[in-house]
Amino acid sequence: MCQVYRVKIYLFISTLLFSSDVIENKEFIPDVRLKDINKKKVKLLDLCKDYYVLFNFWNMACEPCKKEMKFLNQFHEKYNSYNFKVISINMDSPRSMSKVKKYVKSSKYSFEVLQDPRMDVFKKMGGSIMPFVVIADSSGSIVNKHIGYNLGDEKALEEEIKRLISFKIDTTKIDAMKNDK
């Protein structure tokens, strides 16, 4: 009887230890504040509350970044009602910020643009090449990363967005069908 009790305790403790290893290895959005292009400080984790967030890292010299951002803006507008949003993080120097503001305004982007001029957040999230995309869930847990951009990548990215928000979309359709009756 005592032996069975010890085995149960061992299994319980092993399960706890294994579970904590899994949790510790999970990647999260860093708990930091960045300034937006109007110099207002924003906490990254607060942006994730109730949303899937696609963080897009870019700079003005990156032409593939600019091509990708057109699609990201479409995704931001198309899926925002499904608790999905795009947050763009620019990595140009502070002295280039007037050019960044002009570009964002002339492109009519509807997503929020933050600044990471020292590339600290970019590096913390594992970035090495631009454009760099990180998708996080509402807890700030990183669920996907994508490096670079080639024409057609936006299709795979949109499929990933649809997959992540599919539960929300399905329940919305069910609610709509109930209301039609």
Listing of model-derived features with the role each one plays in the protein:
Residues 83-97, 109-118:
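Thiol-based oxidoreductase modules, predominantly thioredoxin-like and allied folds used
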Residues 33-53:
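A short beta-strand-turn-helix
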Residues 51-53, 58-61, 129:
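Short pre-active-site segment immediately N-terminal to redox-active cysteine/selenocysteine motifs
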Residues 135-181:
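Thiol-/selenol-based redox modules, centered on thioredoxin-like
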Residues 54-55, 86, 133:
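Hydrophobic beta-strand anchors of alpha/beta hydrolase catalytic cores
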Residues 103-138:
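Short, internal strand/loop/helix patches
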Residues 5, 9-31, 48, 170-173, ...:
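N-proximal helix/coil linker or "cap" segments that precede and/or mark the start of modular domains
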Residues 57-74:
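Conserved redox-active cysteine motifs that mediate thiol-disulfide chemistry
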